[in-house]
Amino acid sequence: EGRLKDMADCCQTFLEVYGILEDAQGGGAEAVRHALYTAVSDLCPQAVDDRNRELLDPSLSFARDIVMNRDLTDLRYLYLYGDYISDNELDTARYLNQLPQETVTAMAATFTEGYRRGFELAHVDLSKKSLVDVRYCIGFERVIREAVKQFRQMGLEAVIYRFAVHLMNRRGSEKIGYYGTPANAQCDYDHRCDLGLFLDHDLKQRKLDAQRNAYERRRELAAGMAGPAVMEIFGEEAFIPVNKPEAVSYTPYQLKLMSQMQRDSVRITYQYINGEERSFAIISYP
């Protein structure tokens, strides 16, 4: 996405931690924990605001531009995401490229019409909305391209974003957005509770305040969000995680903070995105 400041912030934190570990009098583990806490706390408002904009602002079109504008018959387009690309993504894209156009259009229509039908069944006026939250697995771009076109015919622009990577925006090892096969699923699992290194009441409140401010800045965009349209996959090679004693875990107090933060985060979201005026669709492909 070209976010050089984010990269610079990470490099700065890395160098600070490296310096602590190189210095025999550097303070050890507690000094490292404090450095990480300070970095995450300082960057929290911007990280949360950036994520909020990703979720709502269609002008952030990094992924949508790949889907809509690249030559999908040239599988090198997959590497433009900057994500790990496995044989799963390559083989999926290659297979979809072999299908006739009418089949791909029908696959997309099943997805988009199911979304529209959800609004009809709920007696919700879709014409009031302008945005749809499109989530998918990398490799399905040919279907997603058709889906974006069909959503536009309904008056909806697709908002497409990467799964969250900043610690304050992640939800354990769950991935919401577009994503591919993990390079190391065990590593993702090991680090699902990293926020437990330093989560406290102040950090929880800092995130919630940042989220509320971000939604307030994008009140009109939030009001236009119709809800998620999710294209999932099944049949992947089974992953059996190993619980490692070295991995960070939450204390009972931190688990309570996490529960409060998730509850209050949902409440803030529903203040700006009316749950009674939204719907969703989920479809799964092998």
Sequence positions of predicted segments:
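Active-site bordering "gate/hinge" segments
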Residues: 1-286
